[in-house]
UniProtKB/Swiss-Prot annotation:
Chief subcellular location: membrane
UniProt record, GO biological process: response to auxin; response to brassinosteroid
Location of this chain's protein in the cell: Cell membrane
Tissue/organ expression: Expressed in flowers and etiolated hypocotyls.
Topological category with respect to the lipid bilayer: Peripheral membrane protein
Name of the protein: Protein SMALL AUXIN UP-REGULATED RNA 12
Similarity annotation: Belongs to the ARG7 family.
UniProt KW keywords: Cell membrane, Developmental protein, Growth regulation, Membrane
Keyword Coiled coil carried by entry: no
GO CC, any one term: plasma membrane
Keyword Zinc-finger (UniProt): no
């Protein structure tokens, strides 16, 4: 049990770090004291996908999945994590939805 809790804490810390690097997810959104959007349930985080930058809320458990990690690496290579666009995933929405349904 302690290992799972430690893993979840690590995932949460990683997510907070990524979101802070992205700095601004939306100009008119409300944030909590940690700088996280209030409309995102605990244990989840927002990502923006596709040309239209559609917003998806995904569980932090995805951070440990190899295919999602690959998407994050692509995002870092293409956009970096220090920009004002939020965490942007560089793939088509249909591909992202297919991947997330496979993972979840």
């Amino acid at each position: 049990m302690a290992v799972k809790r430690s893993s979840k804490l690590t995932q949460t810390a990683m997510l907070k770090q990524i979101l802070k690097r992205c700095s601004s997810l939306a100009k008119n959104q409300c944030y909590d004291e940690d700088g996280l959007p209030v409309d995102v349930p605990k244990g989840h985080f927002p990502v923006y996908v596709g040309e239209k930058r559609s917003r998806y809320i995904v569980p932090i458990s995805f951070l440990t999945h190899p295919k999602f990690k690959s998407l994050l690496q692509q995002a870092e290579e293409e956009f970096g994590f220090n920009h004002d666009m939020g965490l942007t995933i560089p793939c088509e929405e249909v591909v992202f939805r297919s991947l997330t349904s496979m993972i979840g």
